[in-house]
Amino acid sequence: FELETTLEHKKKFDLLKEITEILPPHVSVISVRQPQPLGLGHAVLCAKSVVGDDDFAVLLPDVLVKDSSETNDLSLMIQRFDETHASQIMVEAVPDHMVDQYGIVDVASIPAEGHSIQMQGIVEKPAVDAAPSNLSVVGRYILPAKIMQLLENTPKGAGNEIQLTDAIAALQATDTVEAYRMKGQTFDCGSKLGYLKAVLHYGVDHPKLGEEFKALIKELKL
């Protein structure tokens, strides 16, 4: 609000328009602080008073998802949830020799991109020869409000942490949970190389700076 007011007073209306268009007018931003790093499940639980009785999405900000079509993956997950009331866990295919680095979903078959299939569970970093599939959890979830109560009752694990995957496993006792295979591309910005990859991919596609960015890359003569 202070930035917007300052830009308006200085009559920098182009910058003001750029700032105000970042967030749609019907969207409100509320920050909730996680006082201690006690796991993803605990972080989600911290937002219980804000979420209330609403179903909700969880998006991990260190994973960027670049959409490959006009209809983005998160929209398709929400649509599937609305149609079936089945929770949605976004997954992507990874090379077989890398499955021991990820949380891998247990499914009867591999769905096509943009489609969902019921999952039996999530196996954390399985051995390569014992992995139930090659579909790794990406960091996008569509979940029902009831998962908050399950998180409250989830036993704490190593490091006194509450894990979201444990609450999802408890949810599967009564509800269908599906793995949604994404169509887009992910960038793990939790790693330095993943962050640099994201900068490159988003840079060349930037509507204003993309062409100049491509020219800069050519100048490097890599």
Tell me the role of every PLM-derived stretch.
Residues 1-58, 65-66:
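Conserved N-terminal catalytic core of the sugar/cofactor nucleotidyltransferase
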Residues 2-3, 81-84, 114, 131, ...:
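Terminal amphipathic alpha-helical/low-complexity segments used for targeting or macromolecular assembly
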Residues 16-27, 111-116, 170-172:
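Short, conserved catalytic or adaptor-binding loops enriched in Gly and charged residues
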Residues 26-28, 52-55, 82-87, 174-175:
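Short coil/turn connectors at secondary-structure junctions
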Residues 33, 58-61, 91-93, 181-182:
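Short beta-strand segments
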Residues 64-149, 154, 158:
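Conserved core of the sugar-phosphate nucleotidyltransferase
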